[in-house]
A protein has these predicted regions:
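N-terminal alpha-helical interaction modules that lie
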Residues: 1-93
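Alpha-helical repeat scaffolds
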Residues: 81-82, 87, 116-129, 152-166, ...
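Long, ordered, amphipathic alpha-helical scaffolds
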Residues: 1-15, 181-204
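Structural register within alpha-helical repeat arrays
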Residues: 103-104, 142, 176-179, 183
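Residue at a conserved register position within TPR or TPR-like alpha-solenoid repeats
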Residues: 107-111, 146-147, 183
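Soluble extracytoplasmic domains of inner/organellar membrane proteins
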Residues: 143, 150-157, 180
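Membrane-embedded segments
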Residues: 78-138
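Boundary/linker segments of alpha-helical solenoid repeat arrays
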Residues: 98, 131-137, 165-176, 201-204
């Protein structure tokens, strides 16, 4: 009868669907994690004059990249060289916002692969270099990462020098003292004393 035929067709295709699912359920699409970085000219063309919207939209996408379509990717699997290029691109669109340096310093710096932290350090320093008197906080974050995570004391000291020299008058006093602390930790007590003496003379 027609009903039996339709039931047979339904069961037949249901079985085919189950077989197809069983054979393909372990196949995952190769979505990648960090997308390719466009050129600034491409960005300007596709932003249709609203670069700030592009900055916010793509910033949010980079914040969540790797955690889409049911995936949860560990930071050690991310291509930090691409992230670094994305961060630099965002700064070309808006270097006043603290959104991207915050994302870099407080989230992406937590990678399990400590060697990748150098990309975060370099970006934070370059970001702060554009406006040291207002962006000195990111020198401090870069210095902390260099000293405590990347374990490069000389790099940390070089950033601490930038922090000391660029901090404005209304910045906390410790921004100038950090260099002395790092020098003392390295056993360079005379240099540390010279820094502290200079600070005292400056505020005397």
């Amino acid at each position: 009868s027609r009903v039996k035929f339709e039931l047979f067709i339904f069961i037949f295709f249901l079985i085919l669907q189950i077989i197809f699912w069983y054979k393909t359920e372990s196949i995952k699409p190769n979505l990648g994690i960090v997308p390719e970085v466009p050129t600034i000219s491409t960005v300007k063309a596709f932003s249709f004059g609203d670069e700030e919207f592009y900055f916010r939209y793509k910033g949010f996408r980079i914040q969540n990249t790797g955690d889409t379509f049911g995936r949860f990717s560990p930071l050690k699997d991310y291509d930090y060289s691409k992230l670094y290029e994305w961060f630099k691109l965002f700064d070309k669109l808006n270097n006043k916002s603290n959104y991207i340096p915050s994302l870099a310093a407080y989230y992406y710096s937590m990678t399990q692969n400590e060697k990748d932290v150098i990309y975060i350090i370099n970006y934070l320093v370059e970001h702060a270099d554009k406006n040291p008197s207002e962006k000195w906080w990111w020198y401090y974050q870069a210095m902390t990462l260099a000293n405590n995570v990347y374990k490069d004391n000389e790099l940390a000291i070089s950033i601490a020098k930038k922090l000391k020299d660029s901090s404005p008058e209304n910045a906390p006093l410790w921004t100038k003292q950090m260099l002395a602390i790092l020098l003392a930790n390295q056993g360079q007590n005379c240099e540390a004393l010279r820094v502290i003496t200079g600070i005292i003379d400056e505020y005397d």
